[in-house]
Every structure is written in structure tokens, then in C-alpha cells.
């Protein structure tokens, strides 16, 4: 355990200015980031008598091996830098307000000619407007189904829209008046966009105006004796009122605000946030954060309050709204939709309330108020959110108790069954997927403490063991194993070279051939040997290197041949501290290298259940990547081969000319009429389509090398139309140890 006095800065070297500091452990990892009005006062508090420090702070300073700081001009700048560093380094001793799931939102693709409404989970995209988040996807679908009779906008995918446009008939929603059927020209693009804009206005809270307009149209239709239209409008008004009933008014003044509440114990804190727009609750989200290893700057806590809640509130505000502003900025939403409301209601004000309020105002672009509700509707709503937070914490503790017990039992059972030195806290599993030797891919999934660590998942495109319609599953397992562990050995070699003062010619984490989420190769940069834990950290960033941590248990999906192949690779690389097993399907036998008979785990054991989940997750991940790779190959376009021609400009070309066949007949001058297409690009397009003989000066956009495009044959393209499936051949994709199909 490091002694804080060994890395304490010399007296007088710490400035008294405001700034941000970070503690690193002996391996260079950033473990805590904090800010202070006076760096000297704050940092000196960490180097007091260790026995007088709070237990969480004591754990942090005894884990750290060094401290660094950066001086800033203002406290608001310190707040921004602290947020950026926490986001970049993900320190283990900082509270991280991250959702434990991706909440569904209602997305409106305003960047398309015919905007689409759909339920969405995932990163924000430019030109798409989002409403939510919501707790359940079914709630969005129920409301959307109710509103489609009033706002019959498109909800189908691009493929469905194109198909019905080609056949000239609308889908079922078009026949039952829940879609205006722009695919068959029932409404124009401008009319359809007006419908979508009215829908967005309704969800944004501008409801009274829309209801009054419908009522006026209903009255006019009635006066004109058009009772059928009047009855339909009457039903539309009723549908809107039912939708409004689902969102009861909670703040009578039509306030736009977020209401946050916290429920804490000694180890964890539950956070609940209600998003109120136009006086109605439009969304809700909640999560639980760990406090067991989190440091609170007790010197900054009001001793009279005797609580760490103000610091938790400050960390929540900076992290949560920093992420929201970043997402809204990436989505290029309208002004005022930065994700930061005009008012944020919190249980207590943060210590630096004025600076936090100024920072939030900068994110929004207009004034933001931080308030503690004292009476009335806002106080009542805050109490409701607080009850939700307390209930969420209680439910989380109940689930965690049962889940932690079962995971501990599973890991201990695996250790005993396989006679391991310690419980396999990190398990990696590899699986192979292909269709009759084509599009051969592999997946590698990672479980830590019995839970999936999806940020460490990796894809591989098999190269050496596949090709020309052949596939050797055993050789594929060996290839993936070699590439995975060569990467680790290379990191060891890089660290040793850096320690020896090697120059920048050595391999780095980004050069050479690397494992990526697609299909990178591996090159060896190390000399094998036992795995060194210090190789796991990039000294430049303090963050873990990709694939740097070795597993305690390496699982292959298969039987004795696959296990023998993986074990032989590890022996070849000199790796001795990684256990290898194989899990065969059907009988669920656990194969160990060098053993003639498999290990049989009880069918009802938690250990077998954990291994099955790991294996099935690898199988799912491999098949997902295989399908994606196969789909890209089967829907390839001749334009894909034009270097420098991206997806946006490809779509612009096809939209302008109508098809690849017509594009092929166009001249260079006609192609350059498309915005963003220059002469060199136009020549490269015609060369790729085989419209003229390829020449050296049109090899690609901005490329002086010889032509690499060439005409695309029917074998690759399969059709003149871009990105149209050309058919599916062979049986469904199969895994290395399951030949019965993808599923």
C-alpha cells in the first residue's frame, strides 16, 4: 500500500489558484479527478494524518502513487475541465452518473424528405429530433398509435417505403388512415412534413393550439353539413384529449423543468429525474451509482450539513447535463433543445451553486435557474420524485443481494471444478460463425465478475483459416487466439521499450495492425512470457490499453479439437497463466486441455449457467457480425469501389439520376452538376461503372496511385440498382460448434 507522504508535493510548490487535480496509481491510471477554489488548500487536506481521513478518501490516497494539477482562470473553467477529465479517464473513485440501460426515445427523422416516426435506442444522430426518454418502449408505441390517427405520418423503414413506392400500393396503415401514404403520392412532401411538424408541436407541449384548430375545423364541417368529416375530426379531438390525459398536468404554470431526487445509504445512491415540459411529465430516467469506492471532498462539505448530498448533486449536474448537451449538439437540434431546461429543481444546492448555474446557462445558451422547491406544486412533485428514488434504491438492493450471491457461487464453483488458483474474475469466450465457408467471422466477448463487459467485446474477420468457400473451425479458433494474445504481448513490448527510452519508432496503440470492432489483424511486438499487469495501461493517457488485460479463463465454443488448438497457441506464445476450456453444445461438456474425459458440471449449477451465458453471448455476437458482413457483401453497389465517395454523396448521385444504370449513361458534366461532386470524382465514378476505359489519372479522388477500382463485375455487384439484395444462398449462418442454423 503506497504511503501518501512518498508522493506529496514539496512545500510551497502547490499554487493557491483555482484548478483541477488528478491522482494516479503506481501504474499510471487516473483514479480520481477533483477541482478546488484553492489547489494548495484542497491538496494539503489529502496529505493530513491518514487516520483522520474519511475511509473512502483514505482508500484513494493510499491507492494513488502521484498527483498532478492544472491551474485555470475561473471556477467555471475548473468545472468544465473536471467534467472533461472524468469523461475521458473514467476514474474509479469518482461517481459516474451513467444509465444502467439505454432508455427508449421517440425519434423524428427531420433530415429526410419524408420524415419518419419510430422508437429508437442508441446514440443521437444529426438531423433527427428526439422526444423522451421514456421508461418503457410500450408506452411510446401506445401513445404513437393513438396519435397516428390525428397525425398520419410515415412510420415505415426506408426499405418498406421504397417497396410500396415501386408497387404503387400503400401498406395496411395507409388503408386504415394511420398513414398519409406519401409512398404512393397521396400527399406531397410538403404536406407530409406539415403533418410531422404538427406532431412535433404537440409533443413539445403546444397542445391547446392544435386542439382549438381541430375543433374549429369540426365546427366548420358541421356547418357545411359535412357530418362525416365532422365526426372524424371529433374522434381526432378525443384521441388528443386521451393522449393528454396520459400526461397529467403537474405544474400549473406550464414550467419547463427537470426535477431530481436522491436516495442514499453508505454504499450507493439512487437518482431519479423527471423531465417536465409544458407543465407535463414528458420523460423519466433513473439509475443507481456506487459509492463504496467514491471519494467525496469532505473539506468542501458543509460541516453543519454533515452530508455528502451537495457534492453528489454537483457531480450529477455537471456529468448529466454535460452528456445531454453533447448528445443534443451531435443531433443538431433546434435552439433551446440543448437538453438543459430553464429550471432544475434539486433537493439541496451544490457547494458552488453560482458557478454550476453559470456553466449550465452556457450549455443552454440562456439563463438556467437552480432551485430547491419550498412549497406548492413543485414541492409536491419533488416529494413524488424522492419517493421514486427511495423505492428504486430498495428494489436495487434486493436484486443486487440475490444477483451477487449467485454470481459469487458461480465463480467459486468454476474455480473448484477446474482446480484454478483463484476465481475467474475475467472470462473471455470466442466463437466462429459462417455460411458454408463464406464471410467467416469470430467474436470475443468478455465477462467480468460474472457480468458482460460490452466495451471490451471484439469482432474478427478470419483471413488465414478461411477463403474460397472453405472454413476450418479449429484453425479459425487458433487464429483468433493468436491474434488476441499477440496483441497483449505487443503491449508488453511497447511498455518495455518505453521504459528503456525507446524512440517513437516502436509500435504504439494505434499503429500497426490492431484488433478492432471489424476485422483487424495482429502483429507481434512482444516476446511472450507471463502476462504483466503494468502493460495494461497507456502511459500517455492513463487509460487501459485495448485488449491489455489478460483473462483468468479463456473459453472456446467447441470440444476437444478447439480446446487443443487454443491451448497450443498459448503454449507457443509462452503464456502459462491463462486457463483454457471448451464448452460443447448438446451435452454441455467442459473440455480441458490434455484430459481425455470432459468435466461434467451439474445441470442445475450456477457455474454451468454462467458458462452457458458466456458461450451464448459469444454466439449471438458472432452471428450479428456475420449477418452484417454478409448483408454488406450481398447489397454491394458499384459505387462502393470509388475511393473518396462516401455514403452521402452516393445517395445524392442515385437520387439525382434515379438508378445506377442511368448514372452510367451520364456524362462527366452531368455528374458534376450534383452538389459536392467534382470532375475527378465524376471520372472515377464512370470508371468504376465501366463506362470508359480506366486511366491512371482517375484512380480515385485525391489519389496518385494506379487505378485500384476498375469495373465492377456482376459477380460483385449483382444488379444495377444500388444496395439492393441480390439473394441469399446456402443455409443459415452457423457457429463453430452448432451446424443447425443461425438461431
UniProtKB/Swiss-Prot annotation:
Limits of the GIY-YIG domain: 16-95
Region annotation Disordered: where it falls in the sequence: 497-543, 694-743
Residues covered by the UVR domain: 208-243
Composition bias type Polar residues, residue spans: 734-743
Coarse class of the protein's main subcellular location: cytoplasm
GO biological process, any: nucleotide-excision repair
Similarity remark: Belongs to the UvrC family.
Stored InterPro entries: GIY-YIG_endonuc, GIY-YIG_endonuc_sf, GIY-YIG_UvrC_Cho, Hlx-hairpin-Hlx_DNA-bd_motif, RuvA_2-like, UVR_dom, UVR_dom_sf, UvrABC_protein_C
Localisation per UniProt entry: Cytoplasm
Quaternary organization: Interacts with UvrB in an incision complex.
GO cellular component: cytoplasm; excinuclease repair complex
A GO molecular function held by the record: excinuclease ABC activity
Cited function: The UvrABC repair system catalyzes the recognition and processing of DNA lesions. UvrC both incises the 5' and 3' sides of the lesion. The N-terminal half is responsible for the 3' incision and the C-terminal half is responsible for the 5' incision.
Entry keyword Methyltransferase: no
Organism: Rhodococcus opacus (strain B4)
Residue ranges, compositional bias (Acidic residues): 506-520
Keywords: Cytoplasm, DNA damage, DNA excision, DNA repair, Excision nuclease, SOS response
Protein name: UvrABC system protein C
Amino acid at each position: 500500500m503506497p504511503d501518501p507522504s512518498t508522493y506529496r508535493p514539496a512545500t510551497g510548490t502547490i499554487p493557491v489558484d483555482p484548478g483541477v487535480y488528478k491522482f494516479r496509481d503506481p501504474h499510471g491510471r487516473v483514479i480520481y479527478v477533483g477541482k478546488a477554489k484553492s489547489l494548495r488548500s484542497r491538496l494539503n487536506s489529502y496529505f493530513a494524518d491518514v487516520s483522520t481521513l474519511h475511509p473512502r478518501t483514505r482508500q484513494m490516497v493510499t491507492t494513488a502513487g502521484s498527483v498532478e494539477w492544472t491551474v485555470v482562470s475561473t471556477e467555471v473553467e475548473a468545472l468544465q475541465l473536471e467534467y472533461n477529465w472524468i469523461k475521458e479517464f473514467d476514474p474509479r473513485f469518482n461517481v459516474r452518473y451513467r444509465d444502467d440501460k439505454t432508455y427508449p426515445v421517440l425519434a423524428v427523422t427531420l433530415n429526410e424528405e419524408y420524415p419518419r416516426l419510430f422508437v429508437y435506442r442508441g446514440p443521437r444522430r444529426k438531423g433527427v429530433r428526439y422526444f423522451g426518454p421514456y421508461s418503457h418502449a410500450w408506452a411510446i408505441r401506445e401513445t404513437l398509435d393513438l396519435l397516428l390517427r390525428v397525425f398520419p405520418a410515415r412510420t415505415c423503414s426506408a426499405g418498406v417505403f421504397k417497396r410500396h413506392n415501386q408497387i404503387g400500393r400503400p401498406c395496411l396503415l395507409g388503408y386504415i388512415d394511420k398513414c398519409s401514404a406519401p409512398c404512393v403520392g397521396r400527399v406531397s412532401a410538403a404536406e407530409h412534413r406539415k403533418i410531422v411538424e404538427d406532431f412535433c408541436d404537440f409533443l413539445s407541449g403546444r397542445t391547446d393550439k392544435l386542439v382549438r384548430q381541430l375543433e374549429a375545423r369540426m365546427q366548420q364541417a358541421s356547418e357545411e353539413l359535412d357530418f362525416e368529416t365532422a365526426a372524424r375530426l371529433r374522434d381526432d379531438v378525443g384521441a388528443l384529449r386521451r393522449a393528454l390525459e396520459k400526461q397529467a398536468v403537474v405544474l400549473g404554470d406550464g414550467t419547463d423543468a427537470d426535477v431530481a431526487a436522491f436516495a442514499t445509504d453508505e454504499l450507493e445512491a439512487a437518482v431519479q429525474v423527471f423531465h417536465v415540459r409544458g407543465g407535463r411529465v414528458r420523460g423519466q430516467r433513473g439509475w443507481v451509482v456506487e459509492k463504496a469506492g467514491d471519494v467525496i471532498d469532505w473539506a468542501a462539505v458543509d460541516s453543519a450539513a454533515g452530508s455528502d448530498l451537495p457534492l453528489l448533486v454537483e457531480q450529477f449536474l455537471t456529468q448529466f447535463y454535460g452528456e445531454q448537451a453533447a448528445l443534443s449538439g451531435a443531433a443538431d437540434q433546434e435552439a433551446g433543445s440543448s437538453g438543459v431546461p430553464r429550471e432544475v429543481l434539486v433537493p439541496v444546492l451544490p457547494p458552488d451553486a453560482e458557478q454550476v448555474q453559470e456553466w449550465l446557462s452556457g450549455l443552454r445558451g440562456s439563463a438556467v435557474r437552480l432551485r430547491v422547491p419550498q412549497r406548492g406544486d413543485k414541492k409536491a412533485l419533488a416529494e413524488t420524485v424522492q419517493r421514486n428514488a427511495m423505492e428504486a434504491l430498495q428494489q436495487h438492493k434486493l436484486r443486487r443481494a440475490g444477483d451477487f450471491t449467485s454470481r459469487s457461487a458461480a465463480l467459486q464453483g468454476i474455480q473448484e471444478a477446474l482446480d484454478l488458483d483463484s476465481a475467474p474474475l475475467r472470462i473471455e469466450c470466442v466463437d466462429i460463425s459462417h455460411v458454408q465457408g463464406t464471410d467467416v467471422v469470430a467474436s470475443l466477448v468478455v465477462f467480468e465478475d460474472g457480468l458482460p463487459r460490452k466495451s471490451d467485446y471484439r469482432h474478427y474477420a478470419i483471413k488465414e483459416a478461411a477463403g474460397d468457400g472453405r472454413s476450418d473451425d479449429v484453425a479459425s479458433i487458433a487464429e483468433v487466439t493468436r491474434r488476441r494474445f499477440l496483441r497483449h504481448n505487443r503491449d508488453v513490448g511497447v511498455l518495455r521499450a518505453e521504459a528503456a527510452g525507446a524512440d517513437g519508432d516502436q509500435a504504439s496503440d494505434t499503429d500497426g495492425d490492431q484488433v478492432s470492432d471489424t476485422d483487424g489483424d495482429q502483429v507481434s511486438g512482444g516476446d511472450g512470457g507471463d502476462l504483466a499487469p503494468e502493460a495494461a495501461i497507456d502511459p500517455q493517457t492513463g487509460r487501459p490499453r485495448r485488449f491489455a488485460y489478460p483473462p483468468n479463463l479463456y473459453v472456446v465454443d467447441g470440444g476437444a479439437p478447439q480446446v487443443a488448438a487454443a491451448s497450443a497457441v498459448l503454449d507457443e506464445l509462452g503464456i502459462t497463466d491463462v486457463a483454457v476450456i471448451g464448452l460443447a453444445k448438446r451435452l454441455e461438456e467442459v473440455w480441458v486441455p490434455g484430459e481425455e474425459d470432459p468435466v461434467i458440471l451439474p445441470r442445475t449449477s450456477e457455474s454451468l449457467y454462467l458458462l452457458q451465458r458466456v458461450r451464448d453471448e459469444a454466439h449471438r455476437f458472432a452471428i450479428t457480425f456475420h449477418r452484417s458482413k454478409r448483408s454488406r457483401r450481398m447489397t454491394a453497389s458499384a459505387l462502393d469501389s470509388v475511393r473518396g465517395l462516401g455514403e452521402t454523396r452516393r445517395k445524392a448521385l442515385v437520387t439525382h439520376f434515379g438508378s445506377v444504370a442511368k448514372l452510367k449513361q451520364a456524362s462527366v458534366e452531368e455528374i458534376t452538376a450534383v452538389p459536392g461532386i467534382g470532375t475527378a470524382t465524376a471520372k472515377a465514378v464512370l470508371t468504376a461503372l465501366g463506362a470508359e476505359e480506366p486511366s491512371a489519372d482517375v484512380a480515385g479522388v485525391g489519389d496518385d496511385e494506379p487505378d485500384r477500382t476498375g469495373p465492377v463485375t456482376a459477380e460483385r455487384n449483382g444488379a444495377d440498382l444500388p444496395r439492393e439484395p441480390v439473394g441469399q444462398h446456402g443455409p443459415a449462418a452457423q457457429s463453430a460448434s452448432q451446424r443447425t442454423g443461425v438461431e
